[in-house]
Amino acid sequence: MPKPIFISFEGPEGAGKTSVLEALISELKTKLGDDLVTTREPGGNPISEAIRSILQPEEDNGMDKRTEALLYTAARRQHLVENIKPALDQNKIVISDRYVDSSLAYQGGGRGLGIDNIWEINQFAIDGLLPDMTIYLDVPVEIGLARVNENRQGKIDRLDKESISFHQKVRETYLKLQSEFSDRIKIVDATQPLNKVIDDTRILINQILEDKS
């Protein structure tokens, strides 16, 4: 019987996470069929998608940073209960575009709320469920934001309006987490050409699929 596998993807703005995921999920769907479940945060179900619309408005809604952290955590809890856990209980392979490390990096680091504080509220939400592997696509802030500006199609969200300092804190926190939890969090150099980033990420995914088979 196949074993359940939970993989999350992380990265700062402009790391190319969406492009890498689209390419690899297409490949994996062909290989794994219904055994593969893909989802995203915040989102994945009606409640979490409703929270997403509050968290990612077209205009700044003046949201308090602690409110933001709690809403992301609430969306994560519903996502876990409604999407991730049921799939893992059926021995599926779950790939999530973002998970708890996003909150640690963006709210804990970027917003300055502290990793420990964000981890505490998320422990209550995730009930100990961490990914078997987290793939972190790393890119320097200047390169990432330049990519965002180049590829923007008229839409600007709240994160696009944040300062360089905010994004630097996000990346620094991601790198700190990767250093502390290197057994779980694997880093991929996202400054490379897209095809090379996809290749490096594919190797990591194939490795865990083989290890868990």
From Swiss-Prot:
GO terms for molecular function: ATP binding; dTMP kinase activity. GO terms for cellular component: cytosol. GO terms for biological process: dTDP biosynthetic process; dTTP biosynthetic process; dUDP biosynthetic process. It catalyses: dTMP + ATP = dTDP + ADP. It comes from the Bacteria. The keyword Transferase applies. SUPFAM superfamilies: P-loop containing nucleoside triphosphate hydrolases (SSF52540). Its EC number is 2.7.4.9. ATP binds at residues 11-18. It holds the Pfam family Thymidylate_kin. Belongs to the thymidylate kinase family. Phosphorylation of dTMP to form dTDP in both de novo and salvage pathways of dTTP synthesis. This is Thymidylate kinase. It comes from Leuconostoc mesenteroides subsp. mesenteroides (strain ATCC 8293 / DSM 20343 / BCRC 11652 / CCM 1803 / JCM 6124 / NCDO 523 / NBRC 100496 / NCIMB 8023 / NCTC 12954 / NRRL B-1118 / 37Y). The lineage of its organism: Bacteria, Bacillati, Bacillota, Bacilli, Lactobacillales.
